[in-house]
Design a protein with these regions (language model features):
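Active-site mouth loops of central-metabolism enzymes
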Residues: 1-2, 58-74
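Divalent metal-binding pocket/active-site signature
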Residues: 85-134, 139, 163, 218
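Alpha-helix-loop-beta-strand connector modules within alpha/beta enzyme cores
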Residues: 34-52, 99-118, 155-158
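Hydrophobic faces of well-ordered beta-strands that scaffold small-molecule active sites
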Residues: 19-21, 46-50, 88-90, 113-115, ...
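Active-site neighborhoods of metal-dependent hydrolases
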Residues: 76-94, 137-261, 333-347
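Divalent metal-coordination and catalytic microenvironments
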Residues: 15, 46, 84, 106, ...
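Acidic, glycine-enriched loop/beta-strand segments at the rims
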Residues: 218, 246-249, 264-269, 277-313
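Metal-associated gating/positioning segment near the N- to mid-region
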Residues: 1-40, 59, 97, 122-128, ...
Length: 347
């Protein structure tokens, strides 16, 4: 948990004033949300899912509720409700039966279920009553699934940047590590570790994995375009951090990937503003209007025609207050610091 303020600063420095945390150590993220809301810690507004709901062999044991029977669901959902989560996150280990039961119990508490992936078969997953997918996914989405999503109001978060990370396509050219949204908020040792990682020659297995990641990215881009063309709510997401996916800067990269996928710049921007608010069913932000939250990003340029202009930030306004972005930059004197352990630097 060391360095949390640096991560919050990275988000704000990039103009990200609202986030959705889709899985975390619950007391930690819950307290962080509370302290930010109380004004004792500077950071973006946090929506959270708390621990994820997974099957008997959880993918992320430290942050999971292990579900092996439907009998456990009422207690788990009640705990999440008492903890004031905003949504419930269902992970890949849940069977269709358990996922259906989770949706049923969550709805009793007026909680919506976001599901991690499409692995059960997208149409079948949609029929369980979920509210959204946490990732667009790389299997090619079927016309039936698109129809069901539109009929039932099921949304999706994007996270194309994660698939780009799997392909390591972005690490072919590392100039972006010197750009302000990365360089000004990231410890130098982290950037050095990523450069070392990028320079390492891949094994045959790694080359195969990278090629597979590139195909998955291209398929996910097709899916995003189809969802947007079908007028389904698609909201920006990054799943940061992954190699080459940074908190804050990753949102700007995601917008660029969405434009590469065929969205117009304004459609891409909408995924990070209006659509994000629609995803969270919150009418107090997402568009500029009298009475809405004064969270604003003022930039130099014309992002309606050049999406990369979102990076040229003039001013960030959070809850009506202009932020001093200089104070958000990384400062080794104030950061608690920690050794890079168990990371790409050690691989």
């Amino acid at each position: 948990m060391l360095g949390y303020q640096r991560y919050l600063n990275s988000l704000l420095y990039a103009g990200v004033t609202t986030v959705l945390d889709m899985g975390n150590v619950h007391p930690y993220i819950q307290q962080l949300r509370h302290e930010i809301a109380a004004g004792r810690i500077l950071g973006p507004r946090i929506y959270l899912a708390g621990p994820v709901m997974d099957g008997p062999d959880p993918f992320w044991p430290p942050i999971s509720y292990v579900v092996s029977s439907e009998a456990q669901l009422p207690s788990y959902v009640n705990q999440l409700k008492m903890a004031r989560v905003d949504v419930v996150k269902a992970y890949v280990g849940l069977s269709e039966r358990l996922l259906t039961g989770l949706v049923r119990e969550a709805s009793k508490e007026s909680l919506r279920v976001f599901v991690h992936s499409w692995s059960l078969g997208s149409a079948d997953v949609i029929r369980t009553g979920i509210a959204a997918f946490a990732h667009v996914g790389s299997p090619l989405i079927s016309d039936e699934a698109v129809r069901l999503m539109r009929e039932r109001g099921v949304a999706s978060i994007t996270t194309l940047a994660t698939l780009e990370s799997f392909s390591q396509r972005r690490l072919d050219k590392l100039a972006f590590l010197s750009a302000p949204l990365v360089a000004q908020v990231t410890p130098p040792q982290f950037l050095a570790a990523l450069r070392t990682f990028a320079a390492k020659a891949p094994t045959p297995a790694e080359s195969t994995a990278r090629a597979r990641g590139l195909v998955q990215l291209q398929t996910a881009m097709r899916n995003v375009k189809q969802l947007v063309d079908s007028e389904i709510v698609v909201a920006v997401g990054t799943d940061a951090p992954y190699p080459g996916v940074f908190l804050g800067e990753g949102v700007h990269r995601e917008l660029e990937l969405l434009v590469e996928a065929g969205l117009t710049p304004l459609q891409a921007i909408s995924t990070a503003t209006r659509n994000a608010a629609l995803l969270m069913k919150d009418t107090t932000w997402g568009t500029i209007a009298v009475g809405k939250r004064a969270d604003l990003l003022i930039i130099n340029g014309d992002p309606a025609h050049h999406i990369a202009d979102t990076r040229d930030i003039e001013t960030v306004i959070l809850r009506g207050q202009v932020l001093n972005r200089k104070k958000l930059e990384f400062d080794p004197k104030s950061d608690p610091g920690f050794e890079i352990a168990g990371s790409i630097a050690r691989e």
